[in-house]
């Protein structure tokens, strides 16, 4: 195994993410795993993802662990995702904006939109698509997607870069999976108003 950890970011990474990443890097070093880290910044996330994918292919990495810079994850994330033996496997995480829906999708249809998972099986399960906050891909998958599309992450007319990749992969016959034992936090910035404090006091006094 030769692992590339790819982190696309706009301009900065969250401190809590850095703590999680540091623990993971120390664990990989202790276990003598051959790895490299690529933090790629830019205003267009899909281009950052493209550059990470190209490095993985050009430098002959076997896998890419994709981590967004606003994620919180456990130090065993890699071993749990690797245990699936799949070319594509994600952990579970939810959107950081109000509504907080799952970023794991049952279906993606241009005329209907996306259907999110509301509940999760207890074992590894197949999905239609997902966000790329905490995904492990094989370079074999990346090379096939790139070979047939001349891109991995360029957005499609109705799909962002992460779901567009998922569609390209499934169109080639690859199956996408989710490992429910990997649950990540999604760091959000929620404005707090005085009424939020009042609502909180009511919950602790009820």
Language-model segment annotations:
Residues 1-43, 47:
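N-proximal low-complexity "stem/linker" segments adjacent to membrane-targeting elements
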Residues 38-41, 92, 180:
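Residue-level recognition of beta-strand->loop/alpha-helix junctions
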Residues 50-63:
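Active-site nucleotide-sugar/metal-binding loop of Leloir-type enzymes
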Residues 53, 74-154:
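Conserved catalytic core of nucleotide-sugar-dependent glycosyltransferases
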Residues 60-72:
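Short beta-strand-to-loop acidic/aromatic patch adjacent to the donor-nucleotide binding site
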Residues 144-206:
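C-terminal catalytic/acceptor-binding lobe
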